[in-house]
Amino acid sequence: MAEPWNTFVEGDNLDVLPRLAQITGEAAPYDLVYIDPPYNTGNDFAYRDDIRGDAAAGTSRHEAWVAMMRPRLEQARDLLADTGAIAVSIDDNEAAHLRLLMDEVYGEGQRLAQVAVNLNPKGRQLGKGFATSHEYLLVYAKDARRCVLDASSAETVDERDFPQTAPDGRRFRHLPLRNTNKKFNPVTAPTLHYSVWGDPETGEVRAEPFGAAVEVAPVFGDGSPAVWRWSRPRIDERPDDLVCRRIKGRAGERVDIFQRDWLHRDETGGRRKKLTTIWLAAEVGSTDTAVAELKQIVGHVFESPKPTGLLRRLLGTMPDDARVLDFFAGSGTTGHAVALQNAADGGTRRCVSVNSAEPTRIGSNAQVAGYATVADITRARLQAVADTVGGGYQELSAGCT
């Protein structure tokens, strides 16, 4: 029988994480860890660390939060595969402290990005100062040299960036074959400084002289020597992806070589574009859309859930069979996103969600709806996802041996 897409463990994550392999019966490391920890708004943390910070004393409150997070991040590092990555959502209250802490636990050189996520497009209207409209996503590798995270997405490709159309209907754009970065030049990359031949009338390009072709060497706009982005063997292999054109530069008209950069390289596969470090609500969803999608499943029972679109974008950077861990599971967004992504692309991702039995606030929508603890919300959502999206669900006891 196939493993379910979603597994839930109720318990304090500091107790659960060291025994997670024993609890799940699987020692394999995790490819992706995502967490959305408490944002340190001044309330006590619902974890049994015997750590408390005075809400009025800023320094001690930050110290208490960091002390709460440190052992959990260390445990997460130990559970990560060497090729894996961790992503942590955070707001301005602790973004600076979290970054320093993760630099210490994972290594500054392992930091892959600090993404600004536009979760509140209207901006927070309460309080003084600017109307804050974003949070952050800090992303670190366990070993950046081996990390398999692919920071690109097919969804970020804008067809308007590809204005040219080939006779067969394929869209493309012209990119200079010349490397435009002056760090790469005949001194630093001598093997990429060579001449090719092109005919600006027909557009044809070859590595050797032909017909009415003219010799073209790579130069910068000011006429200084440059290098190509492609090696000579690659030009021999893909001459039809190149075109020779006349252009006007600072030194007057000249002949140059361009690459046809295709929107779709073949009939079955599209192209991917590097993700920027600003993620808009229109792309990944907002807090409002997250509340709405949770309301459809279990009701309006959680104040600030994350949208599944945010997690699906993150999941899209990892292999489609990734093992995923969320040990601040909250409303269960990560597990929901895993199921949606698997259903969309045929992947076999599996997610383990851990959440404590933190009591819901007295008089809150969640308590009125019958959810005594936040873990009850997590459980209800993941069960509902299994029923509606598929993939199965299991709950494991944190006390099993």
Positions of the model-derived regions?
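Class I S-adenosyl-L-methionine
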Residues: M1-R323, D345, E358-R361
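Short, well-ordered amphipathic alpha-helices
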Residues: V16-A21, L98-L100, T334-L340, L382-A386
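Short amphipathic alpha-helical/adjacent loop interface patches that line ligand
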Residues: L73, S331, L382
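Short, internal active-site loops enriched in acidic
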Residues: D92-A95, G332, G399-T401
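A glycine-rich phosphate-binding loop feature that marks nucleotide/adenosyl-phosphate handling sites
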Residues: E155, G252, A329-S331, Q394-G399
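Hydrophobic, well-ordered secondary-structure elements that form the walls
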Residues: L311, V324, T334, T378, ...
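A phosphate-binding catalytic loop at a beta-strand-loop-alpha-helix junction
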Residues: A322-Q341
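PRPP-dependent phosphoribosyltransferase catalytic core
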Residues: L340-T401
